[in-house]
Amino acid sequence: MSSTVPSLDATSLETVLRNVAERYPQPLIAGQLKDIPRIAFNIRLIATRMGFDVSVCDLGGGIGLFSVGCAASGMRASLVDDFNDQVNHEFAAVPAAVHRQFAVNVVRTDVVESPPNFPADSLDVVTSFDSIEHWHNSPKALLHRALSWLRPGGLVIIGVPNCVNLRKRLTVPFGIGKWSSMSDWYEQTPFRGHVREPDVDDLKYMARDLQLQNVEIIGRNWLGYYHHSGLVRLVTRIADLPLRAFPTLCADIYLVGTKAAH
């Protein structure tokens, strides 16, 4: 099957992503289509700052739509993941069947324990979305290593769930708001759930440690839109726009910054 997709000059990013999502195995298509607004936002975090003619390395993205969406939209994309989550076991052929079809450079390794060796100053963008909260060891060494792969002025984007978002502040006093289910923590080997969710202050700490410039903290509420509760989804639709002005209260938070010049 050809990997050619319509030019972004002729169609929207969302249409490109829809075309890619429909190439996933049938049981995964609905979830990928549902995730298009978030993936399009993540890609535009890059495109609005760097354009589409860039090299991107995504850490821990699994079989999701982001890295292949970057490639389908004209970026040169690499994906680093151990593909050891349950969904990756069930659909082990996805990286070869979908991602490599769009020339994504798939690097299969534990990103923390055995990080890849990209040449210094060889990448324009390094990203990680909803991944570092799962890592069992400190992300510091890997993030500094990833920073060395970036050219001066290159872009760093880290997206995580906010451990103190508004919903958790309101529900925890009522005994609701555990990070992981008991079955995920107690029954799974190895445990792949959330080890530590950051907050805005944590992202700012990381930005200082990495000596990033042009730092932005951005808030969104994707988790609310995807919540199993219809009430939470309804409240999210009402509160999303005003909450974006207060990232400390948002469900999803992003660190965006650039590598300092040598």
Segments and roles (model prediction):
Residues 6-37, 41, 61, 82, ...:
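S-adenosyl-L-methionine-dependent methyltransferase catalytic module, highlighting the catalytic core
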Residues 53-62:
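Conserved class I S-adenosyl-L-methionine
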Residues 55, 76, 122-124:
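Structural signature of beta-strand start/N-cap positions in the alpha/beta core
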Residues 63-75:
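Conserved SAM-binding loop of SAM-dependent methyltransferases across substrates and taxa
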Residues 76-82:
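Conserved SAM-binding motif I beta-strand of class I
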Residues 116-126:
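A short acidic, Gly/Pro-enriched loop at the edge of an enzyme's catalytic core
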